[in-house]
Curated annotation (Swiss-Prot):
It comes from Mycoplasma pneumoniae (strain ATCC 29342 / M129 / Subtype 1) (Mycoplasmoides pneumoniae). InterPro entries: DnaJ_domain, DnaJ_domain_CS, Hsp70_co-chaperone_J-domain, J_dom_sf. Residues 1-66 form the J domain. Pfam families: DnaJ. This is DnaJ-like protein MG002 homolog.
Amino acid sequence: MTLYDLLELPQTATLQEIKTAYKRLAKRYHPDINKQGADTFVKINNAYAVLSDTTQKAEYDAMLRFSEFEDRVKRLDFSIKWHEQFMEELQFHHNWDFDFIRNREYTQPTPTNNKYSSFLDKDVSLAFYQLYSKGKLDFDLEDTLLRRHSIKQAFLKGKKLNDVLKEQYNYLGWLEAKRYFNIDVEIELTPKEVREGGVVNLPLKIKVISNNYPGQMWYELNKNYSFRLLWDIKNGEVAEFFGKGNRALGWRGDLIVRMRIVDKIKKRLRIFSSHFEQDKTKLWFLVPQDKQDNPNKWVFDYKTHEFIV
C-alpha cells in the first residue's frame, strides 16, 4: 500500500484529485464523526501533507519508481511503515526527501510555505530553536545554512541571516508544530493526599531525536518526575514545566500537568494530545504502572519550581 492507496487514488492522480480525495476521506474519518477513525484520519492527513506539496510529491513519486523500493514494497505495507516512522519512531529527514531509501549527495531543500516544512528540516528547525531560546545562531550552524544557495544569495544581498530564515521558511509553522512535543497530562489526586502533602510520581518514556546516536534516529529516555503536593492545590489547577516534554530536532516540548481532585482514584495518570485533546496513551507514550519504583531521589515542588532533597 502506498500513500496514494491511503487516499484511494491511482499514482497518476492530479493535485486537484488529491485535494478532492483528501476532503472526502477527512470528512469520513474525522474523530468527531467516526470514533473509530482517528488513526486513519491522522494517516490520510500525513499522506496529504506529502502528496499536496509538489516538491515532496516529486520525491515520493521518484522513490516509488526506484527499483530498490519496488523490491522492498513486496515485503511490507509501506504506508504503515511510513506512518510508524512519522508518528512513532519520528524518523524525520531533510524536508521529507526520503534519503533513507537511497544514497546520494546532499541536495538543498527548497524553501516552501508548507505548514510543517521548517519542523521537518533538521537544520532549519535547530536554527529556529536557537533563535527562539537565545536569539542567535551557533557559528557552525550558520556556516551549514549558508551553504544553501537561496539563503546565501539573500545573505549576500545584505539581509540578516535570521530574517532570511524566517522569510524563506515557515517560522510560525515551526512554532505551531512544536506543540506536538508537549506532554499534556492529567493526574488524579485524593483530598487526603493533598492534605498530607505527599509525593506523586509521573513515570514517562520520552521520545528523543539526537545526533549523538549515529546508529539510530531516536531513542527513549525514561523520566520519573516527582511532585510535592501542597495543601492549597485546587481542582483543575495547571502547572507547566518548560523543556520537560519530548525532545526533537534541537528543541524540547513542555510538560503540562492538570490536577484533578477525586474521591477515589480510577486512573492516576492520563496522557493527552495537545492537538486532538484526546487520550494519547497509544500514540506516543507507554504509561507505566502506578506502583513502579521511583528512581528519582529528588522531589520537584511545582509551585516554587525548586527541587527538595
